[in-house]
Structure formats: C-alpha cells, structure tokens
C-alpha cells in the first residue's frame, strides 16, 4: 500500500497544532499582542532580528549602530515578562520541531550510512 507522504504531513500539521506546547505558544503570543507595550517591543525585536539576518545573508557587515540597537532591544525584551514567557514557549516548540526534523531525516541518514558501510 502506497503512503501519501503529503497526507502524513498534513496529519503532522494538525497534530502539532493540538500539542500542549503549541497551544501554550498561541496563548502566550495572544497575551503579547493584547498588551500594547509588549507588542511594540516584540515587533521591534523581530524587526531588528530580520535586519541582522538580511545583512548576514547578503554579506553586509553588521555595524556598531545595529549591534547597539540589538542589545538595547534585547534588554527591553528580557525585562518584559510576557515576551520572556513567549520566548520560553517558542523554545519548547523549537525543541519539538528539531526532534521532528531529526526523525524525518532518519531515512536519509540510514541510507547514506548503509551506502558508506
């Protein structure tokens, strides 16, 4: 019986959305968005992250001003308990995603390990 890998992927999507970790992440994200101060700080934090990533991807140097802004924004974010909670929930979700990725990659790793033996 052939397996439709895309059906499995959609089942995984649904399963992820039903995990306590994802539900907690949704709740934490909603709390940040419902608080104007936390929302503004979080959006600024994300904007700075994107700016740094874009510079890295295009080979641009990250100047001192960008570093200073990033440090200031990071400090502000660390002082906001709603954002700290959100980041903790993101980390828990990231652990799950990394575990899933490891599992998904196992067939390829097994293939190449067998081929190298």
Curated annotation (Swiss-Prot):
InterPro entries: Com_YlbF, YheA/YmcA-like_dom_sf. It comes from the Bacteria. Pfam families: Com_YlbF. Belongs to the UPF0342 family. HAMAP family: UPF0342. This is UPF0342 protein lmo2223.
């Amino acid at each position: 019986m052939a397996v439709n890998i895309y059906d499995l992927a959609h089942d995984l999507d649904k399963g992820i959305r039903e995990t306590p970790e994802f539900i907690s992440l949704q709740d934490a994200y909603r709390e940040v968005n419902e608080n104007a101060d936390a929302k503004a700080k979080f959006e600024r934090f994300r904007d700075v992250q994107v700016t740094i990533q874009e510079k890295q991807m295009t080979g641009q140097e990250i100047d001192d001003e960008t570093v200073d802004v990033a440090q200031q924004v990071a400090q502000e974010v660390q002082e906001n308990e709603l954002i700290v909670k959100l980041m903790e929930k993101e980390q828990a979700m990231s652990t799950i995603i990394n575990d899933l990725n490891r599992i998904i990659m196992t067939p390829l790793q097994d293939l190449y390990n067998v081929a190298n033996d």
